[in-house]
Design a protein with these regions (language model features):
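Short acidic/polar hinge/loop motifs at secondary-structure boundaries
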Residues: 110-136
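Conserved C-terminal beta-signal and adjacent last beta-strands/turns
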Residues: 318-331, 335-343, 486, 627-738
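Short, acidic, small-residue-rich periplasmic hinge/interaction motif at the N-terminus
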Residues: 20-61
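Transmembrane beta-barrel wall of Gram-negative outer-membrane proteins
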Residues: 162-164, 169-200, 204, 208-246, ...
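Membrane-embedded beta-barrel scaffold of Gram-negative outer-membrane proteins
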Residues: 277-303, 483-489, 507-580, 585-587, ...
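Gram-negative outer-membrane beta-barrel transporters
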Residues: 341, 410-413, 424, 548-560, ...
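N-terminal periplasmic accessory domains that precede
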Residues: 68-71, 90-95, 108, 129-132, ...
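Extracytoplasmic beta-strand/coil segments of soluble accessory domains associated
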Residues: 52, 69-112
């Protein structure tokens, strides 16, 4: 049945129609705008020696892309699973990624580099351009760009003036609305103001209380200023503010097949970012730029950590984080044989976090009392209170500085590139673990002793990281429509601290007080090392038939050292731990094709293949050599066909059908569980009249059943099901001032 639906929808696209307007290529962007990738690519739209996917405004609207998750599978070997809440911005590229703590892919929005991936997932209206650079970008962009960089640019008030409005409604009472005003105060000064709101009631139900999980309400605003003070100086500022409130987590027990848990779950986030970019041409040969940013993140994640109907324990993680970044960049403006770019970068991030775990009655009975009494039944214990708190407070200041440079030398048809970055980072953890409770020991039914438990432990840990991050590339451009490249780059993801293990540390210390178990050595488990990789890559960018057929192809091999992996400790523990695998090898390829067979029809397709395996990883209990790296798909696939019909007068109709494919995805290091390859079908029809658009759309039209996430808690297994069939309507209004 699914195959029939695919065939019918694909055939519908190829019906007869009038001419399609010229496809809006992704590089249709005001080149004079001050934009971070262009600054560091010596003014080019994108560097030649990189595998990159660029999505413009029109393609983003066709695919209804509003956030990073919309790029998943559209970009080859780029996967962002949609699970949990918006704090879980896990991104996997070419077999590598990160589920918690440090990001593996960098993100900049209007030149603001985000320091915490917990803030990555938010809706972005008025997108002009989305760039995904795959492979390490650490030489120019530094820490946490080991797998790549995402750069998003929104509309400038100097390039467009008017009012833009959008309203959307879909399945599960999902809605999205935004309105933007763009105005020129003068020919050189422009302002824009954007307000947006979105929400959903969620697609799944908690059978314990009959309530929907995944309910969301989000409100945001953006104010952007663009000032061209002179022909040599430009100043841009982008301010963004967002407030998010989400409920629940649709995690389904593998044993029962049900979403059923008793405690409250929610995620709340307040986010502010501001970025000021100044660019000055100090001569006809040299340009200098300054990119300054501030970001504030206040959030609270509270969840039923056991995700069962019983009252085991709950976890809260509440952060108060702020950060500053400063990037000074100088680059050559001449078009001679030698071009160069160099700079100094610094950042400071301060995080105050509270992460208490609260034990409930069932948790006390099962995890503590039963465990203790089994070892000494003659003297059983009973906890004095049926609820108590394991408190963990952290202060984590982190700062870093870096100096970097890169030069390109053109010799005939060849361009030789060499770059180097020296990156230093210092991170400190100050922790305070506390617990104030007690228990009573009985013997022959009588009180034998009362034992108070008063834990008050403070400590301080410091980690220094110093890295040299080189890059070497050679590009061959025998013609304007062909360029081939080979590159060798080093990627880097910063190390950090295992804050989520401190609840286990306290739990084990409690057991140790009662004479059972062994206490953790905090010094040994508190930190994890940086992740480093050597990336070997070859690729080509090919334009054929007067740019009616555009192809990008790349092959890569990655030698990753100390890969950071999230592990679930054995036993009835409450936390997760980040550990370093010894060595991982990943190789594969990517193919992107875009073409216009006729002026009516636009076809796009991407495919990514990754073979990522542990080359050396032994966790002390098992040897995982040769096993696939979990959570990263081995294949991504995207196919799209867009057909346009010019109707009478100012009316037009665009028909779009697309499909995505993902998998195989292994769920654990031993590769005993996996999600098979799956595909989803989407389609839209957009009716346009002058400044007005009406779009009908649907996703997962074949109602494909698949899982997006797997984890264990207290030896219990859980999965999250992917979103079911969804459909909706979107209205856009773009009124441009004359």
């Amino acid at each position: 049945m699914k195959r029939i639906v695919y065939i019918l929808l694909l055939c519908a696209v190829f019906t007869s129609a009038k001419a399609l307007p010229e496809a809006e290529h992704a590089d249709t962007v005001l080149m004079q705008e001050v934009e971070v990738v262009a600054i560091k690519a010596n003014g080019a739209t994108l560097p030649d020696a990189v595998a990159a996917t660029v999505i413009g405004r029109k393609e983003a609207e066709q695919l209804n892309i509003q956030a990073l998750k919309g790029l998943s599978d559209v970009v080859p070997n780029f996967f962002v699973p949609d699970y949990g809440s918006r704090i879980t911005s896990s991104i996997y590229v070419r077999g590598l990624g990160a589920r918690m703590d440090q990001a593996a892919v960098g993100l900049t929005v209007d030149n603001v580099p985000f320091l915490n991936k917990d803030a990555y997932d938010f809706d972005i209206p008025d997108i002009v351009r989305m760039e995904m650079l795959r492979g390490p970008q650490s030489t120019l962009f530094g820490r946490n760009t080991l797998c790549g960089l995402i750069n998003i640019t929104t509309l400038s008030p100097l390039s467009w003036q008017g009012v833009r409005a959008q309203g959307e409604y879909g399945s599960a009472n999902t809605y999205r609305a935004s309105v933007s005003a763009y105005r020129k105060h003068s020919e050189r000064l422009g302002f824009s103001l954007t307000a947006q709101a979105s929400g959903t009631d969620g697609f799944f139900t908690n059978t314990y209380n009959g309530k929907k999980t995944g309910r969301e309400r989000q409100y945001a605003g953006r104010f952007k200023t663009d000032w061209v003070a002179s022909s040599n100086f430009r100043l841009t500022n982008a301010f963004f503010i967002s407030n998010l409130n989400q409920s629940g987590y649709p995690y389904r027990s593998v044993a029962s097949g049900q979403i059923a848990y008793n405690d409250t779950c929610f995620y709340r986030r307040f986010l502010i970012t501001d970025g000021l970019t100044a660019a000055l041409n100090i001569s006809d040969k040299v340009s200098v730029s300054s990119i300054t940013s501030f970001q504030l993140l206040h959030d609270n994640m509270t969840l039923d950590q056991d995700f069962l109907p019983q009252d085991f324990f709950t976890l809260t993680q509440r952060k108060r984080e702020y950060g500053f970044t400063q990037d000074f960049v100088a680059r050559s403006l001449n078009s001679g044989a030698l071009t160069w770019v160099g700079g100094l970068f610094g950042f400071y991030k301060h995080n105050d976090m509270l992460a208490p775990v609260t034990f409930g009655d069932t948790g006390i009975t099962t995890l503590i009392e039963d465990h203790r009494n089994a070892s000494n039944p003659a003297y059983p214990i009973r906890w004095d209170e049926r609820s108590f708190r394991l408190g963990s407070d952290f202060t984590i200041p982190t700062y870093g500085v870096a100096a970097y440079g890169q030069a390109d030398y053109q010799l005939g048809e060849f361009t030789f590139t060499a770059g180097l970055r020296l990156d230093y980072e210092l991170s400190t953890l100050r922790y305070h673990s506390q617990c104030n409770t007690g228990y009573t020991i009985y013997h022959d039914g009588e009180v034998f002793a009362r034992v108070p438990v008063d834990i008050n432990q403070r400590g301080r840990e410091t980690r220094h990281f110093l890295e040299l991050l080189p890059k070497i590339a050679v590009t061959w451009r025998p013609a304007t429509d062909l360029s081939c490249y080979v590159s060798w780059t080093k990627g880097y993801k910063a190390g950090g601290f295992n804050t989520q293990m401190f609840s286990d540390v306290l739990q084990q210390r409690l057991m140790n007080i009662m004479g059972i178990g062994n206490a953790y050595d905090v010094d040994k488990i508190v930190g994890y090392k940086p992740e480093k990789s050597w990336n070997y890559e070859a690729g080509a960018h090919i334009d054929l038939l007067d740019r009616r057929l555009r192809t990008d192809v790349s092959l890569f091999f990655i030698d990753c050292r100390d890969q950071q992996l999230t592990m679930f400790p054995d036993g009835t523990t409450t936390g997760r731990i980040m550990t370093n695998a010894g060595r991982t090898h990943s190789f594969g390829g990517e193919l992107s094709v875009e073409g216009n067979p006729t002026r009516n029809l636009l076809l796009r397709g991407t495919w990514g293949y990754t073979h990522a395996r542990f080359h050396r990883f032994n966790n002390g209990q098992a040897d995982f050599r040769g096993k696939a790296v979990p959570y990263a798909p081995s294949n991504t696939l995207f196919l799209q066909a867009v057909y346009a019909i010019d109707l009478r007068g100012d009316w037009s109709l665009d028909l779009d059908v697309h499909t995505t494919g993902t998998g195989k995805i292994y769920w654990n290091e031993s590769n005993t569980l996996h999600q098979p390859f799956y595909m989803q079908l989407g389609a839209s029809a957009t009716l346009s009249y002058k400044d007005l658009q009406l779009q009908l759309w649907g996703e997962n039209l074949t109602q494909t059943h698949f899982d997006t996430f797997y984890f264990m808690s207290m030896k219990n297994e859980f999965l999250q099901r992917g979103k079911p069939l969804r459909c909706g309507v979107t209205i856009r209004y773009n009124f441009q001032f004359s």
